[in-house]
Curated annotation (Swiss-Prot):
The keyword Coiled coil applies. This is Tail spike protein. Residues 911-1064 form the Peptidase S74 domain. BNR repeats lie at residues 360-371, 496-503, 608-619. Its EC number is 3.2.1.129. Changing residue 328 to R: Almost complete loss of enzymatic activity. Keywords: Coiled coil, Degradation of host capsule during virus entry, Degradation of host cell envelope components during virus entry, Glycosidase, Host-virus interaction, Hydrolase, Repeat, Viral attachment to host adhesion receptor, Viral attachment to host cell, Viral tail fiber protein, Viral tail protein, Virion, Virus entry into host cell. Changing residue 647 to A: Almost complete loss of enzymatic activity. The keyword Hydrolase applies.
């Protein structure tokens, strides 16, 4: 690491990229590269300040300077005073040695001019780089001369090594002596070297520091032979367990020594295990130790390892935090486009009740996680059956999932289906789009696109007409080419060769492709996922419902073109009894499979590998431990790194039975197995978590998990499992899944750095969407309250909404809608498409008896686009009532008539001559016929039924009599319903029905445990408004005008006859 960093000026904050012992050793300079005489050394506090140990903030104007230089200039005055005769602590020794090393590094990095330039400003006595280097050696040698700091022994000349510090020494195996390098660092020593061949022996080259035994006695912390009291004092000061006589070799019983260390060390102060393994006959309080582990054999021959804080470089994150039952992240996690996906089952309890296949995601290496997202809805036949998934992964760029259908009553498998969908990704491409002349289809070339018809794609900067924005795949030509349908065509061929363009796919906007596989025989569950190549993958399975057990895999060799085609293969039969839930992974042509042991009194889990995808196997049995959870794993280098969690406290060390129903403290372990050795006899299972919940909250059982590798870290995602309800401690008597009586089952992620020495911390972090989750208060009555305003920018799906008064005095409740649209009946009910409608009711239910009601019928309803107003009064205030379109719709109908109309004046009927044909007078044929029409008195039959002879008498005509007159006079065809004269009307009408609320019904529901619950469900019934029929009618105004014309003609004829008589 360089001790000099330079940045372009103009920023506010700058990073310090080197280590330093004191802030006074950090020098910040504004540089004018054109005129160095103008360079300005800044003063901390006035010109800049430290934001934290690795960041400064500029307070001064940087105008006139083009570079900000930050470098380290360590003072040569000893930071630690060795002359006072006091006992030095290990931290003092380390600081002194670091000071020497820092000065040497600065001598390496800084030029003579730079050293002179900052000599005064930094308070350094190093006049130039050579003086700094000599001073560093002087400090290091003075410390060593006092016998206070030893050399660090490294590898030998024969094996080779890169020496980077003055304190590192190499062994020359030929003479048994150690040598330090006295020249410029770093010094690379190739394998097969000697001191002579790699630089020579003498000042400025290799200098002997004596034989290895002497050096180890004086300065090696493992020795303490010549100066035992010095070492013991140091260890006691450091709270190193060896100060109390502990060996830490993993063989010697260190129980007594550790007990003494605990007794002598104040509570709250940690005992340092110095990275060693201590064998004990009973576990001490591990929380009081750091940087160590303990090997404990509660059962002889069955050792387990327990790691303390800082021994394993790992962190524990909580990645979900919901009131739901979040479990079963088993063998489904994967990494895609640098995002970690952790699929799991989200439900209200063990089983498939209200279950949704879900996932959470992390785009920042597991530091924070998204809110849970449901991938499946409830099954259409819910609550009889529901969806479930234990196998999911990405092949090429498409997500594949084995979606199982299971019964709620017994969790029994009834069907398997392979669902797949494109993952979201963004591509930056060059060329590859063509569009022929006079065609609307464009061909898109994207190697291994993984898309199917209907999948969403988005284009920008394509340089081809019509290929832009959101589109869908129209046809698939092959795995590298597909087409989209553009909105237009052009007269010439188009090709975007050489053009840079962008294409995106969307998981959420694309449909599932679903391939039904039916009920696969001899399968209890399908587990795990392993991508084999760009075309196919494997899924594990087990059968444990009936004997004999089966464990194996399904191999889908061509999942894109033949998703229903798979090959079934089993592990060796001697490993199948009592085995289940295989974890599978595929690395470098080898398929690995680990089973789960299911019986505490039988042999446990087993490990298998196959180089021909399950046709032949090499198998191992894990010794001693019975595993009641799966053992997910990943291959890192030559090691399989496996994780497993207990389902009962002390299961792995004391053989406790699988007991998910008891509140306890199950733990998580991990182990490594080298695939080149392929031997599990000496495998070490190391405890990495004591229990998974923060704050020491107990949980009743730890569920199965998944393992992924990203960059330099391995991630183990796992969760709680409780058979009774979503709460991990206790149970509510009514078994209401939405009442709180414990701590919810949630998911956790253990993140561990990959390396031969896994040490740093063992922390718990809350990574479940901090500051992004909706604040929810969850009361014990099952009601959730969101005490904050919320804004939804997309579709919001709600099963039931109650809007309460928004004011303290309960004056009103308001729904305020901004924009062009209000309530829209969007979705069609899946169980009854004909029932698409929206009901607005002024009362507390959907029945018109509770209040006035308006019902809007959707286009897919049996009564398409109908509006029904139901109330005792329909009042229109302060405005005219008008039809939208002029003279198009009628008021009432032949079967839906108003009884009467109350008007303040006579109605006005349009009689504009400009809208009529040339007027003609009544012809004699019509008037002759009209003379035969009878005017009568009558009573309505329905009125007679109600009132008898007191029914009112009406005046008018009979439409059928007018019809008969017209037929008799040749004005209508016999048996015809069509009349040329509008005075007579005939209408046929269809049967009219409606679905209305009838009553509430108590419905019983039985869960998988036989518990019966009841709900009150509304019952609707169909009512007939009227049956199919026909009606004859007349237009009264036509009758009046016809009668007037008839009478006028009659009077005219009488007047003509009188006039003729008078003339005689």
């Amino acid at each position: 690491m360089s001790t000099i960093t330079q940045f372009p000026s103009g920023n506010t904050q700058y990073r310090i990229e080197f280590d330093y012992l004191a802030r006074t050793f950090v020098v910040v300079t504004l540089v004018n590269s054109s005129n160095p005489t103008l360079n300005r050394v800044l003063e901390v506090g006035r010109d800049y300040r430290f934001l934290n140990p690795t960041m400064i903030e500029m307070l001064v104007d940087q105008s006139g300077f083009d570079i900000v230089r930050i470098h380290r200039q360590t003072g040569t005055d000893l930071v630690v005073d060795f002359r006072n005769g006091s006992v030095l602590t290990a931290s003092d020794l380390t600081t002194a040695e670091l000071q020497a090393i820092h000065i040497a590094e600065e001598g390496r990095d800084q030029t003579v001019d730079l050293a002179k330039e900052y000599a005064d400003a930094a308070g350094s006595s190093a006049g130039n780089a050579k003086d700094s280097e000599d001073e560093a050696r002087r400090i290091a040698e003075s410390i060593r001369a006092a016998g206070l700091i030893g050399y660090m022994t490294r590898r030998s000349f024969e094996k080779g090594y890169n020496v980077t510090t003055w304190s590192e020494v190499l062994l020359w195996e030929e003479d048994g002596d150690y040598y330090r390098w006295d020249g410029t660092l770093p010094k690379n020593v190739p394998a097969g070297s000697t001191p002579e061949t790699s630089g020579g022996i003498g000042l400025g080259a290799w200098v002997s520091v004596g034989d290895a035994a002497l050096r180890s006695q004086i300065s090696n912390p493992e020795g303490a032979i010549l100066y035992p009291e010095l070492h013991r004092a140091r260890w006691l000061d450091e709270k190193d367990a060896r100060g109390w006589g502990a060996k830490g070799d993993g063989v010697t019983d260190d129980t007594a020594a550790l007990t003494s260390a605990l007794n002598d060390t104040p509570v709250g102060q940690k005992i340092n295990g110095n990275g060693k393994t201590y064998k004990v006959t009973s576990l001490p309080d591990i929380s009081r130790f750091i940087n160590t582990r303990f090997v404990y054999e509660r059962i002889p021959g069955q050792p387990l390892y327990y790691a303390s804080e800082e021994f394993v470089q790992g962190e524990l994150f909580k990645i979900t935090d919901t009131p739901y039952y979040n479990a079963w992240p088993q063998d489904k996690a994967f990494v895609y486009e640098n995002v970690i996906y952790a699929p799991y089952m989200g439900s209200d309890r063990h089983g498939v009740s209200r279950l949704h296949v879900s996932w959470v995601k992390s785009g920042d290496d597991g530091q924070t996680w998204s809110t849970p997202e449901w991938l499946t809805d409830l099954h259409p036949d819910y609550p009889t059956v529901n969806y479930h998934c234990m196998s999911m992964g990405v092949c090429r760029n498409r997500l594949f999932a084995m979606i199982e259908t299971r019964t709620l009553a017994k969790n029994a498998l009834t069907n398997c289906a392979l669902w797949d969908r494109p993952m979201s990704r963004s591509l930056h491409l060059t060329g590859g789009i063509t569009k022929a002349a006079n065609q609307r289809y464009a061909t898109i070339h994207v190697p291994d696109h993984g898309l199917f018809v209907g999948d969403f794609v988005n284009f920008s900067n394509s340089a081809v007409t019509g290929v832009s924005g959101d589109m869908t795949v129209a046809t698939v030509i092959d795995k590298d080419n597909f087409t989209v349908l553009t909105p237009n065509q052009q007269t010439s061929d188009l090709n975007n060769a050489g053009k840079n363009w962008h294409m995106g796919t969307s998981f959420h906007k694309s449909p599932w492709r679903k391939t039904d596989l039916g009920l696969i025989p001899s399968v209890t569950e399908v587990h795990s996922f392993a991508t084999i190549d760009n075309n196919g993958f494997a899924m594990g399975y087990h059968q444990g419902d009936v004997a004999p057990r089966e464990v194996g895999l399904f191999y889908f060799p061509d999942a894109f073109n033949s998703p229903s085609n798979y090959v079934r293969r089993q592990i060796p039969s001697e490993y199948e009894p009592d085995a289940s839930e295989p974890c599978i992974k595929y690395y470098d042509g080898v398929l690995y499979l680990i089973t789960r042991g299911t019986r505490g009194d039988r042999l446990g889990s087993s490990l298998h590998r196959s180089r021909d995808i399950g046709q032949t196997w090499e198998s191992l049995r894990f010794p001693h431990n019975v595993h009641h959870t799966t053992l997910p794993f990943a291959k890192v280098g030559d090691d399989l790194i496996m994780f497993g969690s207990e389902r009962a406290e002390n299961e792995w060390e004391a053989g406790a039975p699988d007991d998910r129903y008891k509140a306890s403290y199950p733990r998580t372990f991990y182990a490594r197995l080298n695939v080149n050795n392929w031997n599990a006899d000496d495998i070490e299972w190391v405890n990495i978590t004591d229990q998974i919940y923060q704050g020491g909250i107990v949980n009743s059982g730890v569920g199965v998990g998944s393992v992924v590798v990203k960059d330099n870290y391995i991630y183990y995602m796992f969760g709680g499992e409780d058979h009774f309800n979503p709460w991990t401690y206790g149970d509510n008597s009514a078994k209401d899944p939405f009442k709180s009586d414990g701590h919810p089952s949630d998911l956790y992620c253990y993140k561990m750095k990959i390396g031969p020495d896994n040490r740093v911390s063992r922390d718990f972090r809350y990574g479940a969407v901090p500051n992004r989750a909706v604040p929810v208060f969850f009361d014990t009555n099952g009601v959730r309250t969101v005490p904050a305003p919320m804004e939804f920018t997309g579709d919001l799906g709600l099963g039931h909404v109650t809007i309460r008064a928004s004011t303290s005095s309960n004056i009103r409740s308001e729904v305020l809608m901004e924009g062009e649209y209000g309530f829209i009946g969007k979705s069609i009910p899946t169980d009854n498409p004909a029932g698409q409608r929206i009901i607005f009711c002024g009362g507390e239910g959907t029945s018109s008896t509770t209040g006035a009601q308006i019902t809007l019928y959707g286009a897919n309803n049996t009564d398409s686009r109908r509006i029904v107003y139901n109330g005792d009064e329909h009042l229109f205030q302060s405005a005219d009532v008008k039809p939208y379109n002029d003279n198009v719709t009628a008021l009432g109908g032949p079967s839906n008539r108003f009884t009467t109309a109350y008007l303040g004046s006579n109605p006005i009927v349009t009689s504009n001559g400009e809208r009529k044909t040339e007027p003609v007078v009544f012809d004699d044929a019509f008037l002759d016929a009209w003379g035969d029409v009878h005017y009568i008195m009558y009573q309505w039959l329905d009125a007679v039924q109600l009132k008898g002879n007191d029914a009112r008498i009406h005046f008018g005509v009979i439409a059928q009599q007018i019809r008969d007159v017209f037929i008799a006079h040749g004005l209508m065809d016999e048996n015809s319903t069509n009349c040329r004269y509008a005075v007579l009307c005939y209408d046929k009408y269809p049967r009219m029905t409606d679905t209305v609320f009838s009553h509430n019904e108590i419905v019983e529901h039985t869960d998988e445990e036989g518990n019966v619950t009841t709900t009150e469900e509304p019952v609707y019934t169909e009512v007939v408004i009227h049956e199919e029929g026909e009606e004859w009618g007349v237009r009264p105004d036509g009758i009046f005008f016809a009668e007037a014309a008839y009478q006028r003609r009659k009077l005219e004829r009488i007047e003509a006859r009188l006039s003729a008589l008078e003339q005689k």
